[in-house]
Amino acid sequence: MTVITIAKRGLPKLTTSTSSTTTASSSSTITSVASSSSSLPLLSNSTSSSIIPSITPPSRNGNPYILDSGDMPNGTVFIXVGGIAGVIFLAILLWWVITTYSSHRLTRSVQDYESKMFSTQHTQFYGDSPYMDYPAKENFQDQVHISESDISPGNKDESVKDALVSHTNNEKPFLSNFERPLSSLVSESNRNSLFISPTGDILYKTRLSKLYQESPRLLQKPVIMTSDNVSTNSLVSTISSSSASSLDNGNEKEVGEDIRKPAKIASSPSRKLLNSPESDGSVNRNHSKGNLLVVQSKRKPTPSTYLEHMLEGKEQDE
């Protein structure tokens, strides 16, 4: 057995162990002498050997070309890359949540603003609104729209009185239809609302000024109704008494105006009430057909007056 050792020459240590077997060959020659004088073949035997080295990785001790990573755990690079990717993903997720929440709040605030802007809370004539003191359906009765030919002259006053006075079934004091337009725009039910309609404010001030100028005595006695439909200091009695005194003095036109004023307030622009028989003749002369609630001016209205009448829902004759 032969051991081969390789000397170190600037390379890592390499240890190799080999084993070889050397077999000596021998040849034998048998010579026989025979009478035939023939020769036999030559027999030979030979063997061969090879060296196989074992490879071992070099040691980092004393080798400056190998990084000493003994203080770092295994897979440090993968941990660092995964951490950076996770932080980026969490940042994107947080940004998406914040933008979605902000967009939802903005959309909801815009919807609330638009619902308040286009709602009917500042008018007394269109639909039922939670901002109104009482539902709009309580302002009218079913038997208001009746033709003039179906009722007698005595019942015309009753129809006007029914339109002026409404009642409730819960035995609770309430404002009459005549006093309702005089109430404040910001009532107990909508005092928390910061939105005030300019159109409603104009209508309110216009109605208030006209009522105080044209019929101040009708504002002295409010109507307080109970469930039995009995009124104390009735507004209708006030109108009747003032109408009777006016008839005695020969002022038929003033009677018609006094009766028409509350009827106009109690009715909506789309609901027209029948007037008293005393003023039918003068109304038909001064108004267009089917319009009994608006007094035609003696002269052509100015643009500002026309705008006020248009805001109040009046129909002017050309």
Swiss-Prot record:
- Which coarse location class describes where this protein primarily resides? membrane
Note the InterPro entries from the entry: PRM
Skewed-composition ranges (Basic and acidic residues): 250-261, 309-318
Q: Which family does it belong to?
A: Belongs to the PRM5 family.
* Region feature (Disordered): 238-318
Taxonomic lineage of the native organism: Eukaryota, Fungi, Dikarya, Ascomycota, Saccharomycotina
Q: Name one GO cellular component term.
A: cellular bud neck
Q: Name the membrane topology term.
A: Single-pass membrane protein
* Biased segments, Polar residues type: 276-285
Which intervals carry biased composition (Low complexity)? 238-247
Under what name is this protein listed?
Answer: Pheromone-regulated membrane protein 5
From which domain of life does this come?
Eukaryota
